[in-house]
Amino acid sequence: MDDMSNAACCPPQGPPPLLPEHQMLQLAQQGWLSVPLPPDLAGTVAELFASSATFFDLPHHAKARSYPSKSGTEFGYYVVEKEKEYATFRCRVHTAGTAAAQSPPPTSIKSLHGLEHTAAKAWRGCALLLFRILCDLARWSHLDVSVWDDILDGTLAMPAAEEQMTYTLLRLFRYFPATGVAEPHTDLGLLTLCVGDRGGLEVLDRTRSTDEHPVWINAASQAQTATILAGQTLKALSHDTFNAGIHRVVGNPEGRHSVVFALRHSSRHDVDFGLFGGQGWRVRASELWRFIEVGKVNINTVKKRRDAQRADEELAASALAVQIQ
């Protein structure tokens, strides 16, 4: 598990197995799993926590100017009042080496470059760890590991510029003391890796929960341990063999920092469900993404918009019920 550097260059059979049978079963049934980070990746994540703390300590205008928000909440710096602030990376911005790179405030050039280099290093390490888990999943499902070739094209390293972006992202959070929360939700992608510096992340125990009485478990709260979450795309590709991991963030009196890497399918190729034992139909990457997004409330946007999204969802459900009657 320590040697991740050559995972993307392995022979056709893919990287060596990582997860034992019982952990694969847990990931399938619960939709989540705790795993120790390889030492190199743990060190990189520790560096990223330090760099992100320096970034979040900057004045608001400097953060917003350094990473302007766009694509809703899917790119750049964003604040949710009384809950959290976060920066979303989908490509390099200040270290891209192109004229299109943003001009950061002069006083923070060095720290921004350090933040971005460390984020790119963490992206690579997290992606290769999740790639190993996906290869385990393929073998466990009696599939060839090559099923991930097109789906992961361009996702295993931070893209150099916006025109090379896929849906995959790395997000740095600072949750405010006591009030920093995230409502229960599942993620959209294939697998998500979460590491926090303090407690607050909780996962749903599907085996003991009912609709009326959910049972929440404290997830790993150490910088050397990651929580792996299965997402809605993996659920769809596996034909519901893998549940999506339901999770939330509850308030911590001291606040909380976290690193979240969401590995999502590539936008460069159609997705062939036939490779995963389906009926052989192919969908465009963008169409699959829109399908996965349907009915989802964006828990990382401001409360007013979350409420509006829920209202729209309830209205659509009511209209569908009328049509069925």
Residue ranges: model-predicted function:
Residues 1-79, 127, 131, 135, ...:
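C-terminal flanking tails of non-heme Fe-dependent oxygenases
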Residues 81-128, 133-138:
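Non-heme Fe(II)/2-oxoglutarate
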